[in-house]
């Protein structure tokens, strides 16, 4: 009962890594309908569009060099009616661009712009050329708004999209960097998609869940982790975030190798609720292949 045409919102402008993830998602879910990819200026706008049922969204979640994209993590925790149902990995490689016809033979000392994560992933190139980092809302925006005499860092697709000259290729500090994205939808839609995947026996799932202990005192976190261990739930990631406006209170975000409909998971959640802890599922998606460290 999905629409023939659906909107898929991503962080614009065209040419962001999120745009690449959105194109991958549109291919992956082509059986559900045709997608119109729509660029929005920021993640709050994406969350708003998804929760008001205008379509689905794609948000950056975690980078294997920089870690979690914290504002997006907070946005999903705070969203009353959005959850993730697919996880998509995009390889992150940066080129350095200049305005066509204004080639910089020596870019030393010039301003360089990219998304803050982009600047953080190209520190060697920036230092080598003594460039002055200036953060932009996205790598693609840095490329789109590039002025003569300046440098922008972004995915190779930006060169074609914005008609730029490539000053240097693969200027990132680490090869093999990738960013993981979540495809998000209203919570009831995610439940329906998961029920469909579950009934098709689509294999194993992962769940991202946030816990907020409502009681404080020694051992609260240890008790929570004991429940997960005793249920045989394998945890692949665990981080804490302060709860805004409530000093000393934290939410704990765990990624688990299990689906919420598995009996051991349900039992663990009931026990955690019995301790007086609040839990909210942020995403459930088919398990990724992970290389052994």
What residues fall within each predicted segment?
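Domain-level signature for soluble enzymes in the chorismate/prephenate branch of the shikimate pathway
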Residues: 1-293
């Amino acid at each position: 009962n999905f629409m023939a045409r659906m909107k898929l919102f991503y962080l614009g402008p065209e040419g962001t890594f999120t745009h690449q993830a959105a194109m991958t998602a549109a291919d992956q879910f082509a059986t559900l309908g045709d997608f119109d990819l729509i660029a929005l200026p920021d993640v709050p706008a994406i969350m708003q569009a998804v929760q008001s049922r205008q379509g689905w969204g794609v948000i950056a979640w975690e980078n294997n060099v920089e870690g979690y994209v914290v504002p997006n993590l907070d946005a999903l925790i705070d969203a009353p009616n959005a959850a993730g149902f697919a996880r998509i990995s995009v390889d992150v490689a940066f080129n350095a661009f200049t305005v066509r016809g204004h080639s910089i033979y020596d870019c030393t000392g010039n301003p360089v712009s990219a998304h803050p994560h982009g600047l953080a992933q190209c520190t060697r190139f920036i230092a080598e050329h003594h460039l002055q980092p200036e953060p932009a809302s996205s790598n693609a925006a840095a490329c789109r708004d590039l002025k003569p005499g300046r440098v922008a860092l972004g995915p190779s697709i930006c060169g074609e999209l914005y008609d730029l000259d490539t000053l240097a290729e693969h200027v990132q500090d680490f090869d093999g960097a990738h960013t993981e994205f979540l495809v998000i939808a209203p919570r009831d839609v995610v439940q329906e998609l998961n029920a469909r995947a579950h009934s098709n026996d689509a294999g194993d799932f992962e769940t991202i869940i946030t816990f907020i202990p409502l009681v404080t005192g020694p051992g609260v976190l240890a008790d929570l982790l004991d429940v997960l261990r005793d249920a045989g739930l394998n945890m692949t990631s665990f981080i804490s975030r302060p709860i805004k406006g409530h000093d000393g209170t934290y939410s704990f975000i765990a990624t688990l190798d299990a689906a919420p409909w598995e009996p051991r998971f349900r039992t663990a959640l009931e026990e955690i609720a019995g301790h007086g802890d609040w839990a909210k599922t942020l995403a459930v998606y088919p398990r990724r292949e992970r290389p052994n460290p």
